[in-house]
Amino acid sequence: MTFPFRFIHVPIGARRIAAFLSLLALAACAPTVAPPAAPVAVAPPPAVSVPVSGGDWRDWPLAPGSWRYVPGNPISEARYGEGQTAQFVVRCDAAKRQVTLMRAGVTAELTIQASNRAARFPAGHVDDHGVAMSGVVLNAVDGFLDVMAFSRGRIAVLSPGLPGIALPAWAEPARAIEDCRK
């Protein structure tokens, strides 16, 4: 039996070009997909200022505000609070190689609780740009500063006669501490 038509011999290069053009034609038929929309940045809800008196400090609401790093030479600091009002300050005096931990309000003692250790310090009166604060001065290589810098989640500041405050453990305090160690 013979076939009614003869097969035509086509060179291999022409077959490859035909296959490529076929794929190109199919690709042109595919719909274009729009790029996904960029995620919209949503600000976290403001923290509610609630005086705390008991319970586990890890469950306390965070104090309202956020950390701000203020570079300077020889003084740099990390300030926590709303606007220009600071509730807690970590100040580095690089010339003296000292770190001052300050809390708004006047009290005789500061207890700072990190995720794995707490420390109690006698506090003195410190002036922060005209605002009365209680503070403690530590050597820049004091080990408790590392405990604060590497605390997981939050830090609590307790003082007799003042409500306790819970602060998020962000990078800004560690930056101020490291400025004193350079």
Kindly give the residue locations of the regions a language model identified.
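An ectodomain-focused feature that recognizes extracytoplasmic/extracellular
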Residues: 41-107
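Extended low-complexity, serine/threonine- and proline-enriched intrinsically disordered segments
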Residues: 108-119
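Glycine-centered tight beta-turn/hairpin loop motif at sheet-sheet or coil-to-beta transitions
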Residues: 83-85, 116-118, 160-162
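Short, low-complexity, disordered segments immediately C-terminal to signal peptides
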Residues: 30-46
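C-terminal motif of bacterial Sec signal peptides marking the signal peptidase cleavage site
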Residues: 25-28
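Bacterial N-terminal signal peptides that target proteins for export
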Residues: 4-19
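Internal interaction segment
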Residues: 2-7, 31-35, 120-182
